[in-house]
Amino acid sequence: MRFSTALSLALAVSPAAVFAAGNLGFSLGVKRPDGQCKDQADFEKDFDTLKAHGTTVRTYAAADCGSASLILPAAKSKGFKVVLGIWPDVEESYKADVDALKKAVPGNEDVVAAITVGSETLYRGNFTGPELLKKIKEVQKVFPKITIGTADSWNKYADGTADALIEGGVKYLLVNAFAFWQGKAIEQAPKTLFDDLVGAAKRIADKAPQGSSPYVAIGETGWPTDGGTDYGAAKAGTKNAEKFYKEGVCAMLAWGVDAFYFEAFDEPWKPKSIGDNGNAADETHWGMYTADRKPKFNADCKVNKKKD
């Protein structure tokens, strides 16, 4: 595909960024459709559904719903790996998440793919790059054998906001890229996804310490299905979501880029949020699956997955 060729050429001049095997992962909520907390059995059912596509999920705040202590044994029983999250924006949540991980991780290190400190923290302006780097280093000291990193919007890598993290040697960098929230029509959305990743990856490669190879993957991308809210030229709908998935996400996987799809299942408990345009936006219809784990579209990329 031309997008893949363009991405390959863009990164060929900046070889420090290393992409993995093109595996699909999912952002996974920790609450049931009614807003109650999931238990271990719920996570196991989630994994049974998702294993047809991939065996990695990411969450955002380890203490939320006591999720870390529940999802790790579920992952171990089903052959999954988990990217656990720490929410550092508020000191209370930061400490609670670290404490939750201190209890949950020992004995389950084999199913912890990484720990992310923050999700779009730089994008929201809650930390500077140096401030977030300090938090990441604090967590790395607590979990010396676990890969520690962060996730942020593609433009915060591309515009230099995240330079301190890259230059500081952070080894795990997730790049969130939503053509939908950039207001792109579906016809332009797959190319926008590639352009976003190229912009972030080139900056990461240029700023990474000599000899280092930070792991770079798409941390979040997706498209709302039927029932979702439009955003400018970006129109919600299941057909558009499938098109974006097949022409954008699947193409990335075919090229060899790992990607986390946002999200695994609808979350009907979520309240509306206010977008950058000031309008209320629905966040309950972003799942590849409905809240009761029914598929919305055929998610078979027809690409060969690398064996672990």
Swiss-Prot record:
Keyword Hydrolase: yes
UniProt catalytic activity: Successive hydrolysis of beta-D-glucose units from the non-reducing ends of (1->3)-beta-D-glucans, releasing alpha-glucose
InterPro entries: Beta-glucan_modifiers, Glyco_hydro_17, Glycoside_hydrolase_SF
Listed SUPFAM superfamilies: (Trans)glycosidases
GO MF term list: glucan endo-1,3-beta-D-glucosidase activity; glucan exo-1,3-beta-glucosidase activity
Function: Cell wall glucan 1,3-beta-glucosidase involved in cell wall biosynthesis and virulence. Crucial for delivery of beta-1,3-glucan to the biofilm matrix and for accumulation of mature matrix biomass.
The protein's name: Glucan 1,3-beta-glucosidase ARB_02797
The species this protein was found in: Arthroderma benhamiae (strain ATCC MYA-4681 / CBS 112371)
Phylogenetic lineage: Eukaryota, Fungi, Dikarya, Ascomycota, Pezizomycotina
